A protein has these predicted regions:
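N-terminal domain-start signal
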Residues: 1-177
Length: 177
């Protein structure tokens, strides 16, 4: 009954199966379509603020792909959050031979995670360290970009994210070293 009701909502167009993973994918794809329009609906500083917030989901997606590749999970099992890149780009990144190839795929649309991933890969190939350092660099870059905006709440939020990520990174690296 739940699936029938769900199929009659905005999610119905994306619902392709009867299992919980199918429902998750339908919700995420619908959300990606809705959220994906946000940067085109606003201009100026508001557009940059939206982009900076969506980049966080891109970081999550890249980390999820790195883990999936390392463990042999298929792309279809990776739940992508709505960010600044289309699912096709993430699929191409997943299909890359290695993390350096993923960075190359992300560099084509000029994504800032490409540069961050390349820099981290020069330091380490250990997946846990790659993830931790990638997040640390990413949040530092995003916080720097937010400083140029006249959005104090966003700047404060991203500064808090940087502090939290620095703590998380320190604990992860302490545990793995």
């Amino acid at each position: 009954d739940f699936l029938r009701l769900l199929s009659e909502t905005v999610y119905g167009g994306e619902l392709a199966g009867q299992g919980l993973p199918d429902v998750d994918r339908a919700v995420l794809r619908t959300q990606a379509k809705l959220v994906g329009d946000l940067p085109r609906l606003v201009t100026g500083e508001a557009r940059e603020a939206v982009r900076l917030l969506l980049l966080r989901n891109d970081l999550h997606n890249l980390q999820a792909l790195l883990r999936a590749k390392a463990t042999g999970r298929p792309f279809e099992e990776v739940l992508l959050l709505p960010g600044t890149l289309r699912e096709e780009v993430w699929r191409q990144a997943y299909e890359a031979q290695d993390p350096a190839g993923m960075a190359q795929v992300l560099a084509v649309p000029g994504h800032p995670l490409a540069r961050a991933l390349r820099a981290v890969l020069r330091e380490t190939q250990d997946l846990a360290r790659v993830e931790a350092l990638l997040a640390k660099r990413f949040f530092e870059d995003v916080a720097k970009a937010a400083k140029g905006l006249d959005q104090p709440a966003l700047r404060d939020y991203l500064a808090l994210e940087v502090d939290a990520e620095n703590l998380r990174t320190a604990f992860k690296l302490q545990g793995s070293g």
